[in-house]
Amino acid sequence: MKTVDKSYMKELQTNHIHHNLSVAQLVEKILYRQEGILTSTGAVRATTGTYTGRSPEDKFTVKDEVSDQHVNWGKVNKPIQEEVFNQLLSKVISYLNEKQEIFKFQGFAGSDHTYRLPIQVINEYAWHNLFSRQLFITPTEEELNNHQAEFTVISAPGFKADPAIDGTNSETFILISFKKRIVLIGGTEYAGEIKKSIFSVMNYLLPQQDVLSMHCSANVGQEGDVALFFGLSGTGKTTLSADPYRKLIGDDEHGWSPNGVFNIEGGCYAKCINLSEEKEPQIYNAIRYGTVLENVILNDNSREPDYDDTSLTENTRAAYPLENIDNIINPSVAGHPNTIIFLTADASGTLPPISKLTKEQAMYHFLSGYTSKLAGTERGVTEPLATFSACFGSPFLPLAPSKYAEMLGKKIDMFDTNVFLINTGWTGGSYGVGDRIKLSFTRAMVHSALEGELNSIETITDEIFGLQIPAHVPGVPDELLVPKQTWGNKEAYMKEAQTLALKFHENFKKFTLASETIKQAGPLYKG
């Protein structure tokens, strides 16, 4: 077990700490303290004020002798001095000592007992403590009796920093010290910071134990075959991994160890925008007693959630334990992945709907982490924006992206994993001209990939991107598979495809540590 310096805990008065309250006790506290309100579903709803999403500009990592040589310092991992951290920690503890009551949750991150991290979360707010209880792994009574936290999250949303004095970017701060093994959060009520800070911690610790930490969803078939789904927001990751014929391992964060795949979390933090029972029954029916709804608008009288109302934010969320879903595997551990699917929603309409990747191409596209974001303006003019996020989770990676890519490459080799790139975006033209690829076709492609039907099928090489396109996929029209054939204007297609290829090359320049074979696995067209 890791020896952790917890001298700071001596300064935190304990007579006002509620330890490991039950869901019922926390719901009671939330309502009594007027932190949230009860909804018709039985869930509690809380709002987060100014911050309705993460604050990446306010996230810093302490640069010291422990982190200095390991962390990939830069825009994502901004350094902060140890002295700045220590002073803020002292101030936050003094602030919490003045509170009438605070809340502590003890649990784990990581479903595989070999690699799990014992954690504790100390919260100013009861609703944040319920959120932590639902998102992380709750210990048994025996585990709780022997629990020794190896990482602590301290969350004090009511404490606002003074940048001029405290050395922060703003009144909000998310600070990680790998030496003290503390995450310090202040000035933001957005609960996602608690979840994602522990994910960042696991992305630092797990690779040191030969475990690849991944921002992906995962499910397992009836024969024990495991699939991973990587993809940025809006690519269909949640929709496609929720499959009635396969059991869910988890929806967001996983580790791939020498034993297989395991969920890092014990719950889900699902998007609620436009949620309906018809479209996403699994999520819709999981929202019940004990669930935390974040920034969801309610009907004043009935207290029914209105998932279509985005007046507070489009980033409305529900936090609930995995047990709220019927179709799960418990515990959340499974074997090695047979299939990996990278999802992209390409608005240029030039990437193939499905292609089979070599190991080198898999590492290239993993590092690229490409999708399109659709930026809307008030006049309704939308200009798609090519977005690249390394390893499909750049904001949460303390180490160099190439470290995770190398681990992925080794594991693909070791376990002979098939990797596919599936485009859930546009066909027959770019956004505004073409059409979104039908979900039924995408599901057919995913099904064929998972069933092994495409492993030895004849392929066509894409002339721009160098990708291997299956000549036939059951349930999908053959002409849809080759993007150029779906465009009326072939010249316009070539121009659009070449533009995207150059964006890939431009983005990849930053990966100076990548090997030459990986660099060569990008688009064939180089301008």
UniProtKB/Swiss-Prot annotation:
Binds 1 Mn(2+) ion per subunit. Pathway: Carbohydrate biosynthesis; gluconeogenesis. It holds the Pfam family PEPCK_ATP. Substrate binds at residues 54, 190, 196, 317. It is found in: Cytoplasm. This is Phosphoenolpyruvate carboxykinase (ATP). Keywords: ATP-binding, Cytoplasm, Decarboxylase, Gluconeogenesis, Lyase, Manganese, Metal-binding, Nucleotide-binding. Its EC number is 4.1.1.49. GO terms for biological process: gluconeogenesis. GO terms for cellular component: cytosol. Its main location: cytoplasm. Mn(2+) binds at residues 196, 215, 252. GO terms for molecular function: ATP binding; metal ion binding; phosphoenolpyruvate carboxykinase (ATP) activity. It catalyses: oxaloacetate + ATP = phosphoenolpyruvate + ADP + CO2. Gene3D superfamilies: 3.90.228.20, Phosphoenolpyruvate Carboxykinase, domain 1, Phosphoenolpyruvate Carboxykinase, domain 2. Involved in the gluconeogenesis. Catalyzes the conversion of oxaloacetate (OAA) to phosphoenolpyruvate (PEP) through direct phosphoryl transfer between the nucleoside triphosphate and OAA. Coiled coil: none annotated. Its cofactor is Mn(2+). It comes from Oceanobacillus iheyensis (strain DSM 14371 / CIP 107618 / JCM 11309 / KCTC 3954 / HTE831). Belongs to the phosphoenolpyruvate carboxykinase (ATP) family.
